[in-house]
Structures are given as C-alpha cells and as structure tokens.
C-alpha cells in the first residue's frame, strides 16, 4: 500500500506543468448567461485538481453568442440584371406594348400571364362578366387593333379579383399582386369623382357636406361586401368562406380592394359612363334609399336661381352618363360648370375685384388659354364666365354664404379635390411602372397633403386675392391657423374650375407646370 500513497503525495506537492496566467489572459464574453455559477465539484476532488481546472477552463471558453437577426428575404438586395436580361424583360412586358394608351398600358401586368392565371380566367371570368352584364365573348375580339382599350378588359378584369390570399401561390406572384393593387389604387379615385359629379348635378342647391355623407353611405367599406353579394360576386372573392359568417377584418379589406379594382378596370377600358351603369344597374345602388340620406341639419335658405336644366326635374344617373356636350359648348363640362357656378354670379361683373385682382390672377395662372372657336363671341363668353368662376374660387364662405349659400368656393372645391386626386393617381401610375399600389397610395397622400396644396398657392402670392367677410378679415390675415386651410380650399377650387372649363389637361397643367406639385422645377434664388 506504500507506493500508491507516495505517488499521490508527490502528485499533490509538485507544481502543475502549465499555468493559467489569469491576470494576462483576456476572455471576451459576448453575452451574459442567466446563471454563471459553475456546478459544484464532487467532494472527493481537491480544490486544485487538474480535472476540475480543465472543466472550469472549458466552461469559461464556452461564450454564448447573441442571436443574429437576419434581414427578411425581401430586403436583401439582389444583383442588378445584366443588360440582356433587362432588355428581354422590358420587351416581353405587356406594360410597354401600347404607345397610344399610356395609362391603360401602365396598369397591365408587368409580365405575361402564366398558365395558372389562364386557368382561373377560363373557369371564373365568364361568371364575373355575366354578373356585371358584359358580353361573354373574349375581349380580344372587340374593336380593331391594340389601340382599342376594350380589348384588354379580360386581363384587367382578371387582375381586379386577385386580392392577396396567403394560401394561394397564384395571387402572391409579383405581376398579379402589383397589377391588382395598382388597379384598386386608381379605382378608389374614379369612384369618388363619379359620385362627386353625379351628386353635384343631382342636388344643385346642396352643400358638399351632405353629399360626402351620401357617398360614404353608398361606398363606405362597411357596405362594400353587401354590394358584392348583391351582384353575386362574393363567391369569386371568398370561394371557401361564408361571407355572412366572416369577421369584419377578414371580410372588409378584400371586398374593398376588389370593388375598387373592378372600377379601375372598367374606367380604363370603357370610361366613366360605364362606371355609372355598373354602379346603379349591376350593383343596384339607389341614391334615394333611406340608408343613404344625410343627417338632418339646419339649412340656409337658398333664394338664388339654379340653371334651367336643374329646375325642371332631378337628374338621374342615365342623364349624367349619357350627357354629351354640344359641339359649340363654351366649356369641356358645361353642365358641371353650371352646377357649381350659380347664374347669379353675373351680379359681380365689373366690381373692384373683377377690375383690380382678376387680371393679375389670370396672368399668374396663364389664362385665358388659346382656343380655336368658330365664332369670336364664344371665346368672349367663355372668358367672361372664366372670370366669374375665378372670382367664385376666391370667395370665402364668410363673405356671402349666410345670405347666399352657393356664393362661395365650396362646390368647386369639392370637384377640385376629386379631380386632383385622380390626376395625381394617373401621373404616379404612368411614372412608376414597377411600384405596387400601397407604395403609390403613400406617395399620393404625401404629395397632396392639404398643407402643401395651400403652400403652392402662397408661393405664387395668390392668397392676397381671397375675399373674406369684413368681420373676419383681420383674424384670417394675421392667423395662419385660420388662413392656411382657406388657401388650400382656394387651390382645390381652382383645379375644379379648370376641370369644368378646359377639362383634365388643364388640371395637369396647373398642378405640374404652374404650381409644380411634384417640386421638380428649379426654384428662383
């Protein structure tokens, strides 16, 4: 028993063959563990046994690295396409196939439709077209040549129904997803403008407040699933769900996107008259329905005249959809102009504003535009009406509204809001061919924020020509919280007047050349 005991004693008394250099060794700990106390050594092991020291060293080396967060795959930058692939992609894209129809071309899918897309069209498109009253023949047979917009209806109508369904691989494809979102981005402003024009002509004495309530009651997001079900389209939007049993957050967003996109496609292919037909005939909307009436409010007595065509009877949607201006009409939209500018405005001809301020305003805005009229008297009459419309645009409600409710810019402001929304939406669609609808909607909202609209008017120093009531003149001129919203309203009223008198091209000219909404023109130093 002697030698083993001596060996053990020698082992414990001799120094260890390696040293730890604990003072000079730097150990980098990347994270702190919850419990760093090492497990207790067995009682039979002495404090400086090699096995214990090795175990402690191994534990100290075991540093817990923090969990790395990798970016999602959609944010990882891809290498740019080489020239050949980029050229091939652009040449095969349907978006660049139509030179004569740039807006419609920008809403076509960015890549040719796949076999899965064609399968869906073969199975369900006939049902959708029948529900809205369209011929069942393929749209490629309509018209002659690619310049006929109706020939592309099948593709756009297919995209309108492809709301993003996480369980469907087909709706997650980029060309389908972006094509659908671009259509609903356009369709929402088409609907707003359609109802705006309809209600302004149907209710010639009403202020815009009740009209907005009527529009919300007809196409608010809560009622859109009901309209889809009324037209028997709910089975195409929700093929596997019962619409009545779905909760709101699952039912309303897809219904809203599909409803808007349908009207985006119809507007691109058939124009605004077809939008009215589908709204009131296929979906069965009734503006006289009890649920669509505005809340009761104190009405100001309107003693002023309205145009003769509004006095006889209340206009229907067929009157608005079928209306074509006569060949020698003064304006691009004569009936809309007469619905917004009351005949009594002629009493303001020759007043101080007409003599002093109107020429400066017209010079700043580039009015009157050169027109090729057959008779010089038509040009003269148009310029007189344009001057009265401009005076109405600058007429603040505080001046005459209490005695004469329509002698202010409110109705022109309402139509101006809607037309500037649509013009900016069309501009963004043609400018950003690859952008999805959500990105376009955000850019649209940021560009047309109310505070910017008024700022562009103030940049041209036109705010000095606004006609306020005597009681509020000082308050508005020295308080920007009151003044700036009124300059925004005047800006939008100018767009409404430009649309009524000269049409949509003049709204584009005002927005992008005169007021430079996109802020791309060089500024004077």
Swiss-Prot record:
SUPFAM superfamilies: RNase III domain-like. Keywords: Chloroplast, mRNA processing, mRNA splicing, Plastid, Repeat, Ribonucleoprotein, RNA-binding, Transit peptide. The keyword DNA-binding does not apply. It is found in: Plastid, Chloroplast stroma. It comes from the Eukaryota. GO terms for biological process: Group II intron splicing; mRNA processing; regulation of gene expression; ribosome biogenesis; RNA processing. GO terms for cellular component: chloroplast stroma; nucleus; ribonucleoprotein complex. GO terms for molecular function: double-stranded RNA binding; ribonuclease III activity; single-stranded RNA binding. The keyword Repeat applies. Residues 1-28 form a transit peptide. Residues 125-271, 403-503 form the RNase III domain. Disruption phenotype: Pale green, albino, and albino stunted seedling phenotypes. Lack of plastid ribosomes. Binds specific group II introns in chloroplasts and facilitates their splicing. Acts on both subgroup IIA and subgroup IIB introns. The substrates of the subgroup II also require the CRM domain proteins CAF1 or CAF2. Binds both single-stranded and double-stranded RNA non-specifically, but lacks endonuclease activity. Required for plastid ribosome biogenesis. Interacts with RNA. Part of large ribonucleo-protein particles that contain CAF1 and/or CAF2. This is Ribonuclease III domain-containing protein RNC1, chloroplastic. It comes from Zea mays. The gene is RNC1.
């Amino acid at each position: 028993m002697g030698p083993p005991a001596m060996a053990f004693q020698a082992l414990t008394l001799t120094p260890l063959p390696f040293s730890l250099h604990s003072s000079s060794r730097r150990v980098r700990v990347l994270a702190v563990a919850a419990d760093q106390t090492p497990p207790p050594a067995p009682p039979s092991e002495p404090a400086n046994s090699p096995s214990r020291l090795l175990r402690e060293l191994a534990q100290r080396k075991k540093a817990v690295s923090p969990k790395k967060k990798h970016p999602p795959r959609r944010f990882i930058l891809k290498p740019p396409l080489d020239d050949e692939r980029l050229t091939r992609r652009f040449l095969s894209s349907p978006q660049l196939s139509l030179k004569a129809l740039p807006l419609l071309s920008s809403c076509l899918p960015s890549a040719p439709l796949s076999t899965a897309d064609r399968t869906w069209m073969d199975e369900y498109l006939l049902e959708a077209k029948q529900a809205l009253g369209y011929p069942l023949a393929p749209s490629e047979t309509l018209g002659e040549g690619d310049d006929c917009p109706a020939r592309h209806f099948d593709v756009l109508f297919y995209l309108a129904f492809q709301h993003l369904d996480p369980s469907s691989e087909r709706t997650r494809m980029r060309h389908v997803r972006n094509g659908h979102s671009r259509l609903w981005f356009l369709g929402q402003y088409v609907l707003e403008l359609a109802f705006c024009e309809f209600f302004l002509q149907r209710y010639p004495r009403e202020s815009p407040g009740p009209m907005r309530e009527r529009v919300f009651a007809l196409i608010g997001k809560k009622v859109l699933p009901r309209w889809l079900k009324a037209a028997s389209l709910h089975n195409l939007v929700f093929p596997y769900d019962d619409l009545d049993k779905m909760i709101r957050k699952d039912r309303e967003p897809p219904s809203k996107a599909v409803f808007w996109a349908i009207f985006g496609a119809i507007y691109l292919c058939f124009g605004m008259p077809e939008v009215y037909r589908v709204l009131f005939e296929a979906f069965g909307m009734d503006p006289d329905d009890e649920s669509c009436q505005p809340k009761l409010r104190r009405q100001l007595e309107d003693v002023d005249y309205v145009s003769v065509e509004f006095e006889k009877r209340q206009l229907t949607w067929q009157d608005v959809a079928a209306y074509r201006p006569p060949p020698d009409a003064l304006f691009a939209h004569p009936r809309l102009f007469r619905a917004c500018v009351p005949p009594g405005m002629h009493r303001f001809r020759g007043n101080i504003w007409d003599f002093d301020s109107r020429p400066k305003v017209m010079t700043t805005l580039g009015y009157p535009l050169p027109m090729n009229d057959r008779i010089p008297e038509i040009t003269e009459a148009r310029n007189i009406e344009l001057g009265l419309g401009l005076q109405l645009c600058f007429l603040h409600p505080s001046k005459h509204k209490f005695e004469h409710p329509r002698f202010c810019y409110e109705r022109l402001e309402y139509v101006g809001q809607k037309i500037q929304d649509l013009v900016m939406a069309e501009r963004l669609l043609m400018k950003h061919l690859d952008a999805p609808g959500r990105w376009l909607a955000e850019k649209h909202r940021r560009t047309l924020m109310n505070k910017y609209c008024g700022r562009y008017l103030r940049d041209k120093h036109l705010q000095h020509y606004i006609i306020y009531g005597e009681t509020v003149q000082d308050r508005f001129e020295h308080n920007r919280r009151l003044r700036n919203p009124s300059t925004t309203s005047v800006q939008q009223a100018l767009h409404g007047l430009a649309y009524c008198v000269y049409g949509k091209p003049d709204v584009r000219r005002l927005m992008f050349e005169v007021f430079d909404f996109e802020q791309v023109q060089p500024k004077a130093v």
